[in-house]
């Protein structure tokens, strides 16, 4: 077990923020808009997972570009979700949404740009892995192929894009339908985090299905927690694609803790548990009562 202190978790978040800050020099209004979107008060959970999985594997491989890719995908999805034609949100990450400040045209271009940059970062991380010592340099091509397949599936019409569609146009407000939205819209991007951290961190490719199970349990717990905390607001807005509103708060709480325990158990089985993952799990339980 790799022990990472809470301060190290904070240091990693600071490093991610520094990399994000320098990713788009403010040469024009588009880059300014992208910087505005990515430099909010986000918790950086998805890129953190990439870094933590790779570090726990102990191979000392650089996965920082893959970590940025996940934050780019995530931010791109938030920009699109916030648009008037979607969820019509006015606030995101404690400040006005991107389209409120820069207009819808620049918001759309920012979302497109972040998605393409995310794929470029994945390619760059593959090139970085080629420079590593053996056996990792020989794994780089397959790692990049796996990462690109995972990212395109999880962010595209088989993943988060379809999830947003089903969220906007729900067929039924039943537990099965809501679980499908969670699987497509939330779990997919977490799958990207765990898988990219694993393959670019030098993990055993034969364990990928179990790594995806990690994402499934973590992503479900993560979304259930959000739904529990958002129950009152979602009820007022008549947003019924909320699992806690459908099954009730207590059942949702029980499901949350079940998923979290499955996640922690599988972390240990894959030998990638760490003090930082434990800290993240503790943070997820905060404010739940």
Regions found by a protein language model. Give the residues of each.
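N-terminal amphipathic/basic leader segments beginning at the initiator methionine
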Residues: 1-21
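Mg2+-dependent prenyl diphosphate-binding active-site environment of isoprenoid biosynthetic enzymes
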Residues: 21-225, 231-267, 273-285
């Amino acid at each position: 077990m790799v022990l990472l202190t809470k301060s190290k978790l904070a240091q990693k978040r600071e490093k991610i923020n520094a990399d994000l800050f320098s990713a788009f020099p403010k040469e024009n209004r588009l880059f300014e808009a992208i910087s505005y979107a990515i430099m909010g008060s986000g918790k950086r959970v998805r890129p953190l997972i990439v870094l933590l999985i790779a570090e726990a594997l102990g191979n000392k491989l650089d996965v920082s570009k893959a970590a940025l890719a996940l934050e780019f995908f995530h931010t791109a999805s938030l920009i699109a979700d916030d648009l008037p034609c979607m969820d019509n949100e006015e606030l995101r990450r404690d400040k006005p949404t991107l389209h409120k400040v820069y207009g819808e045209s620049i918001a759309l271009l920012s979302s497109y740009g972040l998605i393409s940059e995310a794929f470029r970062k994945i390619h760059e991380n593959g090139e970085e892995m080629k420079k590593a010592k053996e056996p990792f340099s020989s794994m780089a091509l397959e790692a990049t192929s796996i990462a690109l397949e995972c990212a395109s599936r999880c962010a595209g019409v088989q993943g988060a894009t379809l999830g947003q569609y089903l969220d906007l146009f729900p067929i039924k407000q039943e537990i099965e339908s809501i679980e499908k939205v969670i699987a497509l819209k939330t779990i997919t991007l977490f799958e990207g985090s765990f898988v990219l951290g694993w393959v670019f961190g030098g993990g055993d490719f034969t364990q990928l299905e179990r790594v995806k199970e990690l994402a499934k349990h973590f992503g479900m717990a993560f979304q259930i927690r959000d739904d529990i905390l958002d129950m009152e607001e979602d009820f007022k807005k008549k947003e019924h694609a909320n699992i806690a509103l459908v099954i009730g708060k207590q059942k949702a709480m029980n499901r949350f803790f079940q998923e979290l325990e499955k996640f922690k158990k599988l972390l240990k089985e894959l030998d990638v548990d760490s003090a930082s993952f434990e800290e993240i799990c503790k943070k997820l339980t905060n404010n739940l009562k």
